């Protein structure tokens, strides 16, 4: 299986039914092409936005929980200590867009791409995003 870093925006989009995020997770559930990985802090980020997600989502609490469980079962959380050695390189590449440094450092460590809808991130490092 190929590794693919997933950012919090993709997880949120899958719950909101925006874009193709949920479809990608559903297809991967069948095809098993990717091992999705994310920094451990992604769940902290997700929880920060949970009330906003609940307001914007057209899903019931039960449906949202089901989707979140389905998505999170496919994502392996990686400890910061496993990719700390790539953080300075990621920060240098991203310059003033430091909020995504963990995702890039993880992608650099695993030599893989990033699944993200962040336009600025894509512009700064199109080779990986």
Where do the PLM segments sit?
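Short, flexible helix/strand-to-coil boundary loops that buttress conserved ligand/catalytic motifs
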Residues: 15-16, 50, 125
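Acidic, PIN/NYN-like endoribonuclease modules and their adjacent C-terminal/linker elements
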Residues: 104, 108-129
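Histidine- and aromatic-rich ligand-binding microenvironments
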Residues: 6-7, 37-40, 95-100, 118, ...
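Alpha-helix capping/helix-boundary segments
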Residues: 10-11, 42, 103, 120-121
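PIN-domain endoribonuclease scaffold, especially VapC-family toxins
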Residues: 27-33, 37-89
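Short, flexible loop segments at the rims of nucleotide/cofactor-binding pockets, characterized by
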Residues: 12-15, 89-95
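Short, well-structured N-terminal submotif of metal-dependent ribonuclease cores
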Residues: 1-38
């Amino acid at each position: 299986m190929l590794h693919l870093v997933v950012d919090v925006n993709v997880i949120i989009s899958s719950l909101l039914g925006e874009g193709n995020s949920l479809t990608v997770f559903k297809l991967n559930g069948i095809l098993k092409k990717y091992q999705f990985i994310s920094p451990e802090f992604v769940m902290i980020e997700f929880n920060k936005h949970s009330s906003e997600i609940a307001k914007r989502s057209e899903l019931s609490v039960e449906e949202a929980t089901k989707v979140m469980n389905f998505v999170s079962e496919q994502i392996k959380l990686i400890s910061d200590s496993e990719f700390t050695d790539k953080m300075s390189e990621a920060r240098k590449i991203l310059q003033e867009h430091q909020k995504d440094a963990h995702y890039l450092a993880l992608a650099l460590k695993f030599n893989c791409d990033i699944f993200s809808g962040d336009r600025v991130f894509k512009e700064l490092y199109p080779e990986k995003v």
